[in-house]
Amino acid sequence: MKKFILIIGILSLISSSNAATITGGVEYTTTDARLELQNNRPTSADFILYGNNYIDAKRDENISALLKGVTKLNDRTLAQFSDDTYGIIYNNDPKHVWYYSNDGTLIYAEEKASLKYPYRTYKYTPDGELVNMTMRVSESETFIFDTLGKLLGHWVGQNCYDESGNIVMTRKISK
């Protein structure tokens, strides 16, 4: 009986040392996130929605707002990235994120599996090619993997880190 209790104690210490505790007690390691994404991968994207979003019709208004530091507008939320791209989430379509180049051309469309954390997202090119998969653990933490499951980045707050812990991109977050 003592051996059993000792083994259970050691196993619980080992497993908890390999995971990060997130708000609400949800734990995800890089491996957990990778497996969740690969095991639930969609077969295709819903491209009916993409047609109206190939060009950002409100590009000038969006860029102007971002230059002023405004990210929340009446019908949408904006995000600005350090590589001169930006993203839009429309209030009436919160399960999609549209990513545009600085000239307002669609470069990626992302589909969310849910709106409750933790949830999966899958990012596609306008031609429908899967680019990456993410596991949104919380509002401030996201794991990003390529289509083969290699970790591309780990967002924590405003910074995205590579596997070595180097900052590879930043973003502005509004509260």
What is each PLM-predicted segment?
Residues 4-16:
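Sec-dependent N-terminal signal peptides
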Residues 21-175:
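Repetitive, compositionally biased segments used for assembly/scaffolding
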